[in-house]
Amino acid sequence: VIYSPECFVKIKDGQIYSYPMKGTIDAQVPEAKKKLQTNPKEINEHNTIVDLIRNDLSKIAREIAVTRFRYLDKIQTQKKEIYHTSSEIIGKLSPDWKTQLPEILLGLLPAGSICGAPKAKTVSIIKNVEEGPRGYYTGIFGYFDGENLESAVNIRYLEKKGEQMIYRSGGGISRPNLYFQGANLTTKYLPDYSGPYHIG
């Protein structure tokens, strides 16, 4: 089960779009919008991911432009409302992009929002410390109708193995206890399930 997927890339009329999302807060927090928009850590992380995605897109497209920067969205989840900040980045693909679609997607993987920056170094560290394969977690899925493409990243992922439910969700480098608290918080939005969850 995948929930709250994040857009990977969208291709429409020969243009490629990406919407990096960094920065989320519970809408019920007092002055939530202001806290999210002025938080130095959130601003820095957002700037970093926008720069990374611009760089990634420049490898497979031209005329890269950030058309919207750190805009605020209000999202209704199953149990509450949240605010998050995103940006919109656009590039122009070559006229024959359809014949190069596999190379375009592979050239953008892994998603910048998953690995962060610097990309090559971070991916190397992840490969060294992770204990096993991720499977579908943090991969992408989508559809291509012959003209346009929509795709998304599996950023929160629930997998059933036998009688066990394995929940996968990531986060940036932080203090381990705060990361674990955050991971536990996100499980509140999981479907009701009477068995044990394993947070991985």
Give names to the regions the model predicted:
Residues 1-200:
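Extended alpha-helical targeting/anchoring segments
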